[in-house]
Structure formats: C-alpha cells, structure tokens
Design a protein with these regions (language model features):
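Signature of the SF2 helicase/ATPase Hel1-core->accessory helical subdomain module
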Residues: 63-65, 69, 92-95, 99-103, ...
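Conserved RecA-like ASCE P-loop NTPase motor core of nucleic-acid helicases/translocases
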Residues: 82-92, 399-403, 476-483
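Conserved interdomain hinge at the start of the Helicase C-terminal
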Residues: 389, 448-483
Length: 507
C-alpha cells in the first residue's frame, strides 16, 4: 500500500470534517472524525469493522466520505472501478442517503476539487416493487368504465408516469399484485425493449453508479445468488457498508428461515386456477383450509404472538394430506406447468415437511397476528454460519455500524449473531455519543405508585396520573411507550380529556 496516498487520504478527512463541512453548516465532531479515520483504514486494509456509533455522531457522513476517498485515492486495480454497497434496514434512511447525504457531499467535494464529477447512487430492490408496463396496460383496460374507488383509481393511473410502486400512495394491494413485475418475464413480451423496469436495470448496471443502496434482505438475496453461481442481483462491489447493522440478523432470519401463511396458500391455489387446473386448486385449497383450522387460535389477540409448534394428531393428519397432494400434483403437472409454479409447489412441500418431520435444524413455531390468523415459521439454527458463508468469506472489506451493536460493554453477542466469531479480519471501534446523557437525562421512578392488579382499571388510572404530571413538567414534549395495546387504550381514555397539549395515539 502506498503510504503517501494513505496519508493524503487521512489528511483529506481532516480538511473535510474540520473545514469544508463546518463551512456548510455542520459542527465539528471529534468522534465523527475518529470514526471516519477508522472506517477508511478498514477499507484500505481489507478488514471487517464493527463500529458502534452513538446518537448524534453523524456516522452516515463518516462512511460515505470514507468510501468516496477510497475511490479517489485507490481508483486502479481489478476493483478500482467497482461500486460500493450500502445496505440499510429502513426505506427512510435509503431515501435520506440518496436524496440528502450524497447530493450534499457531492456538491461540496466538487466545489473543492476532491472529485472530478458528481457521485451517482441508485436504490436497488426487488422486481416486485416495480411496475410491469404490459400488466399495467391490461389492468387499466380491465378497470375502464368500472365503478372503482377514486383514490385507488388515481393511484393506479399515476403508474403510467411512475414505475416505482413504493412511491405511490393509495394503491390497493390487489392492484399492486396485478401490475407488479412478475417473478419471470416472458421473453416474447412485446414491450421488453421499452419496459421501464428493464431500463432501470440497464441504468443500475452502468459503471457510472458508484453507490448501490439496498436493504438487508436484498443484500442477502444477492449473496445467495453468488453462492449458487446464479446471476448476482448487485453489480460486483469493492466494499460493503451495513448501516442499521443490528437489524441484519432479523433479515437473515427471514432469508434463511421459512414461513407459510394463509395468503401464501391462497396465492398458490390462485396460480393453479389461472393455469386452468381448477379441480387441483380446489382440492389443494381444502387441504390447506384443514391445516389452517388445526393451527388457528380462533380469537382476537391483544397483539401478535408466537408459540412453539407442537405436532398434534390433528396437525399431523392435516400436514400429511397436504404433503401427499403436493407430491401428486408435482408429478402429474410437471409436463404442463411453468417451471416457476412447479418450483412454488416444491418449496411449499419442503417447508411443510419441516413441521411434519420436526426438523431439528430449525426452530419451529407458529406466529399469530392480531386476528388470530396463523403462519408456520421455521428459523434456522445455523444462521451465524450461513451469514459467515454469505458475506464474510469473500475477501471484501466491510463496515457494520449502528448505535446498538454493543451489549454490556462488549461486542461478543453481536459477533456471535453475525457469524463473525471466527473471523480473523475483524476489528472493533466505539464512537461515544456527544450527547451528554448525565446532564440532560433523568431516570424517574415514582415512589408513591400503589400496587394494582395488572390490566385493571386502577392500574390505568395510576399510570394516567403519573403521565399527566410528567407531560406538564415537560410542557408536552413526551413520548409514552407501551408493551400492551389494551393498556395503552385504557390509559389514553383516562388522559385524553385532561391535557391542554395535542395528543396522538399511534397503533
């Protein structure tokens, strides 16, 4: 590694954060500067860094600056022209990165000759989040002259000028499913050359895009494609940043686990119906209905709940019937069904078989929503090893950052969950929050709360009294969090007529 270039890159960090950004309204934060130096070293030395960055550090500016300086000072080599990937958990952060952070830094860096041209970024996401122009044309024709909700009609027609489904409000779930890009595009589609989704893919593959932004699920899906030697979803990249990294295990649980809901079963039967296999769809629907009946709680729940899966005699019989029919259908319909529908039949069979056999590689449970509707869920016990194989063995530098990576002053738990325990390239960095908690926070424990039965009206009244006093003390600047919907509703009813400040209840 060229020592002079490395020193120049670190010198630019000092100039950027001590001079250029303050000239544009940002304060100098020593923790942010130290964090950016550590992140740049991680990228230059091909390491993996766990960066615990407290509230108010400005970690997004830190890692974006480190990535841009990597591109500036080390543009050559096999990875020189490759982009970086920034993976987040929330759409809000993705929007902020592409709409605020990158344009702001790009302008300042251009004005001060740090970069020769603007930094270009693009959000990458699944095809089901985009409009299929052919399917949209069919749907618009189908609703012509029909009595349709006006807001939904406007949302549907707005897709003629906006192909990003996430950017349109008021669109019904049914319309969304009818117009989204299908799992497999027909090669004979007459709109293929003018398709907006394919134009998006073409632009995304351009060498001009330096920052690819995606969510954790998309990142893991790309990694799965690479492991299976399928075409990657993302362009080959030279560095990886995982923001909101504490959410990565949740995404991995979804990716490496399996789940089946009533909606999944309904969709599978609908696919068979569309292929004109009406009787097969009816028989399968009956088997699925019996299985759901064996799982249902049959009651409204205060909040979503999960319970361990127990293979009762009724559930065993229902699962056996479903599996038997799925196997028969795969055998009989193999010459006639599209391959992707056959694949759906196969993956449904495999998922149900986990519960029928009690597969010990998975934690099996039932997830109930608030209506009591069940979903069968299987969480992999091998998730850390799967993450390690997917992300950490590819010899690409990576930065994992969040405000909650440490627990009890240690990264031990995070290393375990992320599959990083045996990684030799791993480094830790802690950037303490500049927020003075000792001076600005008070832990208040009321000493006069009487003992009340849990869930009682008396409990709600006592809590309401304390909350009203605290709201008065803070002049309305209060957020009250509950672990129970029913208790929240009861307290809300107690306080709503007593406050002079605006009150909002969020479910």
């Amino acid at each position: 590694m060229n020592i002079d270039l490395k020193e120049q890159a670190h010198g630019e960090i000092e100039r950027i954060f001590r001079i250029l950004l303050p000239q544009n309204g940002l304060a100098v934060r020593e923790e942010q500067i130290a964090l950016c130096h550590a992140m740049l070293d991680t990228l230059l030395h091909n390491k993996i860094a766990l960066c615990d960055a407290g509230v108010g550090i400005g970690k997004t500016y830190a890692y974006l600056t480190a990535c841009i300086l990597l591109k500036k000072f080390y543009p050559s080599g096999p990875a020189g022209s490759q982009p970086v990937v920034v993976s987040t958990s929330s759409v809000a952060l993705q929007d902020a990165i592409i709409g605020e952070y990158i344009p702001f830094l790009s302008r300042i860096f251009l004005e001060n000759h740090i970069i020769p041209k603007p930094i270009r970024a693009m959000v990458r996401k699944g095809k089901e989040r985009f409009v299929c122009d052919a399917r949209l044309a069919q749907r618009l024709e189908a609703v012509k002259g029909k009595n349709k909700n006006e807001e939904q009609r406007k949302a549907l027609f707005s897709l003629q000028s906006n192909y990003d489904l996430d950017a349109v409000t008021g669109l019904s779930g049914f319309d969304r499913r009818q117009v989204c890009v299908p799992k497999v595009c027909e090669k004979t589609c007459r709109l293929r050359n003018s398709c907006r989704y394919h134009q998006y893919l073409k632009e995304a593959r351009s060498a001009e895009i330096f920052v690819q932004i995606c969510n954790h699920n998309y990142l893991l899906a790309d990694a799965a494609h690479r492991l299976q030697e399928l075409r990657p979803l993302l362009n080959d990249y030279r560095a990886l940043v995982i923001d909101e990294a504490h959410k990565l295990p949740d995404a991995a649980r979804q990716m490496y686990g399996q789940s089946l809901s009533a909606e999944d079963f309904h969709e599978l039967c609908s696919l068979l119906t569309k292929e004109k296999y009406i009787l097969a769809a009816q028989n399968l629907r009956e088997k699925f209905r019996a299985l759901m009946g064996a799982l249902c709680r049959g009651e409204l729940l205060e909040e979503a709940q999960r319970t361990a899966f127990v293979l009762t005699a009724e559930r065993e019989a229902a699962l056996r019937d479903c599996l038997s029919l799925l196997r028969v259908l795969q055998k009989q319909l193999a010459p006639h069904l599209p391959r992707w529908i056959l694949h759906r039949l196969g993956t449904t069979e495999q998922a149900l078989n986990l519960f029928f056999t009690g597969d010990r590689r998975y934690i099996l449970y039932i997830q109930y929503d608030r209506t009591g509707s069940p979903s069968l869920c299987a969480a992999s016990r091998q998730m850390p090893e799967q993450l390690n194989r997917a992300l950490w063995r590819n010899n690409i530098p990576a930065i994992l950052t969040s405000g909650t990576l440490m627990a009890g002053g240690s990264f031990h738990r995070t290393r375990q969950r992320m599959g990083l325990s045996s990684t030799q390239r791993l480094e830790d960095f802690i950037a303490e929050s500049p927020f003075n908690y000792r001076e600005n926070c008070i832990l208040y424990i009321p000493g006069d709360l009487p003992k009340t039965p849990m869930g009682s009206e008396m409990e709600a009244k006592c809590l309401a009294e304390q909350i009203c006093r605290l709201v008065d003390a803070t002049h309305g600047h209060t957020l009250v969090l509950f672990t129970s919907y029913s208790l929240m509703g009861a307290v809300y009813n107690q306080v709503k007529g007593r406050m002079v400040f605006p009150l909002m209840e969020v479910w």
